[in-house]
Amino acid sequence: EDIAVSEVTEVPERFHSRLNATGKIYVYRIATGEVKKVFERRYIYDFGEKPDMELMCRAAEILTGTHDFKSFCANRRMKKSTVRTIYSIDLKEKEGEIVITYTGNGFLHHMIRILTGTLLEVGMKKRSLSSVAELLEVRDREKAGFTAPAKGLTLEKVLYSPLQKESETL
């Protein structure tokens, strides 16, 4: 009852839904207000504090682009490349909530949750902007921010066409 088919497209016989994906869009929701979102509590991280959005946006700019995201990967034994491209990290604030939309060519194990924890640490002034840039160089999971809870995270869309842009998908 939570999943619905919104579109059907004919694909080649050798198409693989995971291997042929060219990108993904994830949304992470954070409650920052004093009033609890009772009916949404399973789908939103109740952070309970209001971080500095301007600092978080500046940190997001540092993380956008093609980088080695090993510091943001929970799998310490990752054998494959940890280089990924984040096309955009969009932060919006509305009614006691922060919504972060991540668009990229692929994401590592717990990468979105670790990125979110790191952005929140910056927003709470527990981490400097310069330390965010250093995380891309040191490639050490222990240096990055906390892993935000899974309940705020939603896979919004899987992209398949190299021509498909975020503006066409939302």
Sequence positions of predicted segments:
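Structured-RNA-binding interfaces characteristic of tRNA pseudouridine synthases
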Residues: 1-170
